[in-house]
Amino acid sequence: KAIRAAGSRAQLVTLSNNASGGFVKALGDNAPGTIITQVFPNERSITSPLVKEVLALAKAKNITDLSPAMLEGFTSAKVLVEGLRRAGPNPTGDKVRAALEGIRDFDVGGLSLSYSPSDHTGLDFVDLSIIGRDGKFRR
């Protein structure tokens, strides 16, 4: 808001952790046109196995609109559960870390996720979305 209040018309770009309705609401009239990096497929992409899986679970809870943050949270939970499973029946922080760092080509709904002791990136997927005049994320 401060950038716009200062009169700047610069194109604003932010990270995926700001891909939420709360962020859009906080920006108010300044939200449209803001570009957000996305590390997951479009939440309306019904061809994505990940989106299909999340949509099915959301429908069961009467949730009709998915957000980019929901896809990230769901995937993070899925990866954590896999790390705990691989860590064994008595997980410790060290065991969970080693288990997560041993994940290679783990399918998280059509996306391949890998970690190593030196690379915690996970996914190589990147896309961009822009906030529309209606406050929705567009691709």
Language model features with spans:
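Extracytosolic ligand-binding ectodomains
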Residues: 1-139
